[in-house]
Amino acid sequence: MLNSTPTPIDARMDALERHLKNENPELLDVVKSYRELDKVAHSVGMLPASESLATRVPWWPMVSVLGTFSAGKSTFINNYLGAKLQTSGNQAVDDKFTVICHSADGEARVLPGLALDADPRFPFYQVSRDIEEVASGEGSRVDAYLQLKTCPSEKLRGKILIDSPGFDADAQRTSTLRITDHIIALSDLVLVMFDARHPEPGAMQDTLKHLVSNTITRPDSNKFLFILNQIDNTAREDNPEEVVAAWQRGLAQAGLTAGKFYRTYDKEAAVPFEDDSVRERFETKRDADMAEITDRMAQVEIERSYRVVGLLEKLAKRIEHEVLPTISREKASIKRKVLWGDGITFGLLGAALVTLTVMAGYWDGFTFAPPWWDGILADPILSGLMLAVLVGVFGYVHYLVRKFVVKSTLKRLDAHATTEFGEWIANAMRVNTKSWRTVLITGPAGWGPLSRRRIASVLRDADRFVQSLNDRFTSPSGDQTPNPAIQSFESENDPMARLPPQDEPAEKHRGSPSVVGEAST
């Protein structure tokens, strides 16, 4: 009987499908397309059989809050959630990356970083490996970098919120910068906060470079919102607008010359305003900017669905148009080097053999005529043995040349495997250069008609998924009939609409991944 026990990655994918069935059913078919894409990635060797491309994206909307020390990130999060979840103040003690999600039992809890590192539903799945790559020995200390907090706030239903420790690129550990880049890549919305009480951005150019310069050139730069927080502290300045102007100049020097620049502060902790007109002006600006920020945060659920589908299409095209051609080029390079190596080596061996036989007097003009030659040719056994020896010598020399070329190629690829793409190529080339594979075939192993059909099917599915999402949230014909999907989305973001009937338990209502009580998944 065949063993039908699912592999760990299959079990994780099955668990993901079960959660999506209850919480985001429109993405169920997308998971199946990721499974098809995994088959191609496994067959060409770019991805180990124990991994899935689906784990490279969190399946729940994600909002991250980055910023400098004392920028008010924790206070902003507490006000947004309506709960004192994060420690705030000038000497905040939360020095870890904190993932915040909805609580299943209505209680606020703090869970260790291991809860994130081992769960593919969250954005830090297996992040310990990335930490270990840049800081040897630190991968086992994942709890020193990460923590998971749960909160019963209704605003967390359907999304994940991430709070980061105060950012300072000058003093930041490489491992912390790696995690920050990981967050930025996966987030649907990134709030970048600065402290208006420190109006000298010129003194923090490295930090601005990492938080601004490296983000505005990204294809998804529209997901970044730059916020000047605690702006109320400038109310007593002779010219408060100059503080804002100083920050705008500093950000412009870092490359941010366009885009929205928000100004906020905490009303409860605001400094007293001596002039009512100044207070009213600050509050009006603050309320308008906060409304825009919270509206963008409410929209991430829609953006996440498009982003997951977009990544599926991007991965399929990247495999077909980047990974596979790169594998073919590397194999062609190996073929060329091996043939040249064989030619040079056999040429040198041939020249040495001719020289030795000439010195031994085995040549009669241009005819090879040693005294034992006719006897070997006349005996089929001896001639067969001699032919076998020659073939063996030539084969062994070819093996040594091939081994040297492959080893040097893999060493070079491993040195460039610091990126996801580089790792894929290194993995694939190990599979494509197995000793039993000939170097004469430069096409990628595992890439055939079936894999081509799978890629084409995934691309068709991606287009269909986008059209399905468009049908849910748009009406190109101008039909005035309310779209049920949009009505559902708006009701989900209305706290009053989320309250369950008195005779229906609250836990039946849909939410983001709620970890308490779900350890088995």
Regions found by a protein language model. Name each.
Residues 2-141:
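Conserved G1/Walker A P-loop phosphate-binding module
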Residues 223, 231-304:
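Canonical P-loop GTPase G-domain recognition
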Residues 168, 179, 423-521:
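Charged, low-complexity cytosol-facing tails and large interhelical loops of integral membrane proteins
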Residues 307-349:
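Cytosolic-side membrane-insertion boundary helix
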Residues 125-159, 172-254:
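Conserved C-terminal guanine-recognition region of P-loop GTPase G domains, centered on the G4
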Residues 105-107, 166-168, 197-200, 231-234, ...:
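Conserved nucleotide-binding/hydrolysis micro-motifs of P-loop NTPases
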Residues 336-423:
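Transmembrane alpha-helical hairpins and terminal membrane-anchor modules
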